Structures are given as structure tokens and as C-alpha cells.
A protein has these predicted regions:
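Short secondary-structure boundary/capping segments
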Residues: 88-94, 146-161, 214, 259
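Extended hydrophobic/aromatic segments used for targeting, binding, or gating
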Residues: 72, 85-123
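Acidic/histidine-rich catalytic neighborhood
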Residues: 118, 122-204, 340-346
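His/Asp/Glu-rich, glycine-adjacent segments
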Residues: 1-96, 195-208, 214-217, 221-236
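Metal-dependent active-site segment of extracytoplasmic phospho-/sulfohydrolases and closely related
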Residues: 110-156, 237-246, 254-255, 259-267, ...
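Active-site neighborhoods of enzymes that stabilize oxyanions during catalysis
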Residues: 165, 170-316
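Acidic, His- and aromatic-enriched active-site or binding-groove loops in soluble protein domains
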Residues: 1-21, 94-107, 152-174
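Long, internal low-complexity/basic segments
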Residues: 307, 313, 318, 323, ...
Length: 346
């Protein structure tokens, strides 16, 4: 379970608003996770998420009602993401003895979030408010009987595959289960976060050992080895594709914190999301994001057939509010969703 120090105002900005929000809405109760496959653990988890969601409703309504000069209200509900991480690999036939219960728990989390949506819908009655519901990703499970072989962890450095290939040298930390330390003096590259491999480059990285003149050749060798790597249990290729960072820019991947190699996995071995492109499906689940729009200035009952990207949401909100689109915005207005727009005229 998680806890929150209610005396620390840094959770809230502006900081002086923290006590006001606490007095009006009470503390935000985080979720409680333990023994998630037991009936008791599952019940407590869902009850805690319902409490958390109820706080979000109270806080949202308090701020919207009291500060009626607001122009944009944004909130983030993370429960669906968390619950799918915990259950989706065991939520289809053949994956777990309680797969039906696990799938129902996922649906229950959606129903909890639906109560937040229901609480916000009355604000559309003024005819001047629009409501956007979006997600940054979906999730897909690994195939039944498959396990990730040690690459593409969402939150840290994955050593197993890169150690097998000879690029990362890691040693177990004494008296700590499944905790390793890296010998940087012998490590040419590491796999960090979901989809990146970083070369331990001399002159760039604190303990770099790879000479700059060897960089390109090493990158190509690692890519070749990733394609050749086979899961030891099933004999299948683990990596779907890998490319240099220059090549990855064609996919919209880039920036100073990205790795030297970008790769994605075959969904059999995935880590729920961030390890495969958006249109990948597996076992009836998809990585495609959600986009629902309703309210002032928007069409009613329409299904938009054009491709919509997450970066298109902000320009569309700007168009509805008749404000300038940010100078470096990468997306475009979803004109097909706007009231009065007709494709036949074009």
C-alpha cells in the first residue's frame, strides 16, 4: 500500500492551496495492493480505488464550482493503467485459473472511472464546455506460457539479455534477491527503460569505455545480435525490430534523453505497453489509445475515421477555445470532430 504525508504541501501547487483542498475534500487516499489474486485482496484493492476516485470527484467539483473563472481543467486518473499492469497478463483464457475474475477486475476499474465521467457531464449543460477523455496508450498481455527474458523493463535497467549478449557486465548484490550492480569498466552498453539501448560512450558518459570511432560499428553489431537473439524457452525471436536513433526519428522518436538504439518486442514477450507500436494487438487486447470528445463545438454521435494522435488533442482544444496553438506544437486540429465541418466541401 501507499501512504501520503498530509502535512507536506509540496504535493499541491500552488502550495498554499494544499490546506484549503484538504479542508474541503479530505486526504487523497492511495490504492492498497496486496495478494491481488485472493478474493479479499481483490476486494480491498477495488474499494481503495473507489475511495481514491471519489476524492478526485470531490476535488474536481470543488475547484470547478468555487473558481468559476477557470478556462481549462485537466486531471489524470491512473487506476486503469495500474490494474491492467497487475492483471492483464492473467486476464484471458489459458493464462490463469482465475482469468475471468481478473478480466472482471479490469472492467470494474473502468466502471469506477466511469463514475468520474458521470460526475463531470452536468458541466456540459452550459453549452460552453467541452469534455475530452484520452489515454496515452493501451495495454496488451504476453502470450500464455511466455515470459519476458529480461529486456524492456518499464522502470529501470534490464540486464539479462544484454548480459547474455556480452554487452552488460553485472553482478548480484550480496544478500539481496534479484538486485544487481553494473561493472561499468567492462560494460559496453545497457538496456534502460522500455525501448532504448545506451552505448557506454567515452567522453559522453561518466564511466564510458567505448571509443567514439567504434560507436557506429558497435551500434550495428548490437542491432544484429538483437535480431539473432532467441528466447531460450520457446526458441522464438524476441525483438520485433531495432534501429539507430537517426532511423527512429521517422517514427517520431527522439530527444536528448533517448538511447542510441530504439527497439520494440514481439508481443509474446511484452511488458504490457511501450514495447510495441500503437497498432499491435495480442490476445484480444490493443495498444491503441482512447479519444472521446463531447460538448460545445463538437459533433454528436460521430465516429472519426481519420487517424488521431495524442498530439492532436491540444490543437483541437485551442481551436475550440479560439486561442493560439503553441508555437512548437507537433499535432494538428481534428477538424472532422468540429461542429459545422463537412468533408464533402473539400
Amino acid at each position: 500500500s501507499h501512504t501520503m504525508n498530509v502535512d507536506v504541501s509540496e504535493y499541491i501547487y500552488p502550495h498554499e492551496f494544499a490546506q484549503e483542498l484538504m479542508d474541503a475534500c479530505g486526504p487523497m487516499l492511495p490504492h492498497a495492493l496486496y495478494d491481488r489474486f485472493s478474493d479479499e485482496g481483490r476486494t480491498i484493492l477495488m474499494e481503495s480505488f473507489a475511495e481514491n476516485n471519489a476524492w478526485h470527484i470531490r476535488a474536481a467539483k470543488y475547484m470547478i464550482d468555487k473558481y468559476d473563472d477557470w478556462g481549462l481543467f485537466y486531471t489524470h486518473l491512473h487506476g486503469i493503467d495500474l490494474v491492467e499492469h497487475w492483471y492483464i497478463n492473467q486476464a484471458f483464457e489459458g493464462a490463469h485459473e482465475k482469468w475471468r475474475e481478473n478480466l472482471e477486475t479490469i472492467y470494474q476499474m473502468y466502471e469506477i472511472c466511469d463514475t468520474f465521467v458521470a460526475a463531470m457531464l452536468p458541466y456540459l449543460a452550459d453549452g460552453e464546455t467541452a469534455f475530452f477523455i484520452t489515454s496515452d496508450h493501451g495495454q496488451v498481455p504476453r502470450s500464455a506460457g511466455y515470459h519476458n527474458p529480461g529486456i524492456s523493463d518499464l522502470s529501470g535497467i534490464s540486464c539479462k539479455v544484454m548480459s547474455d549478449l556480452g554487452y552488460t557486465v553485472a553482478h548480484p548484490v550480496p544478500n539481496m534477491d534479484d538486485v544487481w550492480y553494473i561493472d561499468w569498466s567492462k560494460t559496453k552498453a545497457i538496456q534502460a527503460r522500455s525501448s532504448y539501448i545506451y552505448i557506454n560512450l567515452k567522453g559522453r558518459d561518466p564511466e564510458g569505455i567505448v571509443e567514439p570511432e567504434d560507436y557506429k560499428e558497435l551500434v550495428q553489431q548490437i542491432i544484429s545480435d538483437l535480431y539473432a537473439y532467441r528466447d531460450p524457452e520457446h526458441g522464438k525471436r524476441v525483438v520485433a525490430f531495432a534501429m539507430t536513433m537517426e532511423e527512429a526519428r521517422s517514427l517520431g522518436v527522439g530527444g536528448e534523453h533517448t538511447g542510441d538504439i530504439f527497439f520494440q518486442l514481439n508481443p509474446d514477450f511484452g511488458e504490457e505497453h511501450a514495447m510495441a507500436p500503437s497498432y499491435v494487438t495480442n490476445n484480444g487486447f490493443s495498444l491503441i489509445s482512447l479519444c472521446l470528445m463531447c460538448g460545445a463545438g463538437l459533433k454528436k454521435g460521430e465516429f472519426i475515421k481519420r487517424q488521431i494522435k495524442a498530439v492532436d488533442v491540444v490543437p483541437t482544444i485551442c481551436a475550440l477555445c479560439d486561442v493560439r496553438i503553441p508555437a512548437n506544437c507537433e499535432g494538428g486540429v481534428i477538424y472532422q470532430a468540429l461542429e459545422g465541418f463537412s468533408e464533402k466541401e473539400y
